[in-house]
């Protein structure tokens, strides 16, 4: 099963997926993006495409609930592609050394992310492998 192709069929871009447990129930979440924003109808359409396929080829074992959602303005960045699609956005990063950074993503290559410090405008480059946790954020 190719989630990226199925999302494309619904006019969406696959962003990420995850399996979580909430209140003792398994939830399989599929996060999507779309130029101009994801609407509720987009999520419903993709859910209608995925449900019969997942009935035959479940993405996880056992009973679960399927959720289709926009990845949101403030979203987790866990793949190098996520950083590449987020150039010029603000990000909060925790490094493997537990250093906390708030910066703007300036550029991304195969292994590195270049950031601009929000306070000093100083540029720094981090190895993707040194990033423990990252999330975009919006200043209101």
Swiss-Prot record:
Coiled coil location: none
Keyword annotations of the record: Cytoplasm, Ribosome biogenesis
One record GO biological process: ribosomal small subunit assembly
Pfam families from the UniProt entry: DUF150_C (PF17384), RimP_N (PF02576)
Keyword Cytoplasm included in the entry's annotation: yes
Subcellular location: Cytoplasm
Superkingdom of source: Bacteria
Chief location of this protein within or outside the cell: cytoplasm
InterPro entries: Ribosome_maturation_RimP (IPR003728), RimP_C (IPR028998), RimP_C_sf (IPR036847), RimP_N (IPR028989), RimP_N_sf (IPR035956)
Cellular component annotations (GO), alphabetically ordered: cytosol
Family: Belongs to the RimP family.
PANTHER family in the record: RIBOSOME MATURATION FACTOR RIMP
Biological function: Required for maturation of 30S ribosomal subunits.
Designated name of the protein: Ribosome maturation factor RimP
Phylogenetic classification of the source organism: Bacteria, Pseudomonadati, Campylobacterota, Epsilonproteobacteria, Campylobacterales
Name of the gene this protein is made from: rimP
């Amino acid at each position: 099963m190719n989630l990226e192709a199925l999302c494309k069929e619904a006019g969406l871009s696959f962003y990420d997926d995850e399996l979580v447990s909430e209140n003792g129930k398994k939830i399989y979440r599929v996060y999507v993006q779309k130029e101009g924003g994801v609407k509720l109808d987009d999520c419903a359409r993709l859910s209608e495409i995925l449900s019969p396929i997942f009935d035959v080829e479940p993405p996880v074992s056992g009973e679960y609930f399927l959720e289709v959602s926009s990845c949101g303005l403030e979203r987790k960045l866990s793949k190098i592609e996520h950083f590449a699609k987020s150039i010029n956005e603000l990000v909060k990063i925790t490094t493997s050394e537990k250093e906390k950074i708030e910066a703007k993503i300036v550029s991304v290559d195969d292994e590195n992310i270049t950031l601009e410090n929000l306070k000093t405008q100083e540029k720094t480059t981090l190895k993707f492998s040194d990033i423990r946790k990252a999330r975009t954020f919006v200043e209101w």
